[in-house]
UniProtKB/Swiss-Prot annotation:
Belongs to the ABC transporter superfamily. Thiamine importer (TC 3.A.1.19.1) family. InterPro entries: AAA+_ATPase, ABC_SmlMolc_Importer, ABC_transporter-like_ATP-bd, ABC_transporter-like_CS, P-loop_NTPase, Thiamine_ABC_ThiQ. One of its GO terms (cellular component) is plasma membrane. This is Thiamine import ATP-binding protein ThiQ. The lineage of its organism: Bacteria, Pseudomonadati, Pseudomonadota, Gammaproteobacteria, Enterobacterales. It is found in: Cell inner membrane. The gene is thiQ. Its main location: membrane. It comes from Escherichia coli O6:K15:H31 (strain 536 / UPEC).
Length: 232
């Protein structure tokens, strides 16, 4: 279980403050206007930002100040952060061993994830030789191969065409269910959120303004629907 209790980040001396509980294996969408604090929330969970105050626990262990490299979290960005001089296999392998010295079990795990992502025929290629969708599959494989209990998505598929974006969302959702991972996904699209997350959190002005069923939000009946431009 992921739990944030009054986790506070000072942005130009204006506090953003979050309290949130997410159960193990739950898939949650994080929505809200631009600049509301959605990415800040993910970066606090991932450890890329250190809160001024508050408590963050994962499975009842205090990770409030744990460095990102030691936090049981993986994060996928819109910019996939693949190393251009490394092959697909090497980029995925970094998720298992930063020195890329993989034993037989790790090699097997890497190829299993690549097969699951549909990129097992691309392992010798460089990122520059791949399409945008293929690069995001590689980046997702690198996250999943780490087998961390929490996966954070900061709009990684927003630049893809609609059909490919839906394909990637389905792939993420299915993979998280298979690995029993907790998923938190920032999105500007309530429709995308509804496809994989039964629960949504709406962030506004550095606070969690609303949380509840995604369908209720999409129907326009929720108090936060208007924040997203949804009319009942």
């Amino acid at each position: 279980m992921l739990k944030l209790t009054d986790i506070t980040w000072l942005y130009h001396h204006l506090p953003m403050r979050f309290s949130l509980t997410v159960e193990r294996g739950e898939q949650v969408a994080i929505l809200g206007p631009s600049g509301a604090g959605k990415s800040t929330l993910l970066n606090l969970i991932a450890g890329f930002l250190t809160p001024a105050s508050g408590l963050l626990t994962i499975d009842d262990v205090d990770h409030t100040t744990t460095p990102p490299s030691r936090r049981p979290v993986s994060m996928l960005f819109q910019e996939n952060n693949l190393f251009s001089h490394l092959t697909v296999a090497q980029n995925i392998g970094l998720g298992l061993n930063p020195g890329l010295k993989l034993n037989a079990a790790q090699q097997k795990k890497m190829h299993a994830i690549a097969h699951q992502m549909g990129i097992d025929n691309l392992m010798a290629r460089l990122p520059g030789e791949l399409s945008g969708g293929q690069r995001q599959r590689v980046a997702l494989a690198r996250c999943l191969v780490r087998e961390q209990p929490i996966l954070l998505l900061d709009e990684p598929f927003s630049a893809l065409d609609p059909a490919l974006r839906q394909e990637m969302l389905t792939l993420v959702s299915t993979s998280c269910q298979q690995q029993k991972m907790t998923l938190l996904m920032v999105s500007h699209s309530v429709e995308d959120a509804a496809r994989i997350a039964t629960r949504s959190v709406v962030v506004a002005d550095g606070r969690i303004a609303w949380q509840g069923k995604t369908d209720e939000l999409l129907s326009g009946k929720a108090s936060a629907s208007a924040l997203l431009g949804i009319k009942g």
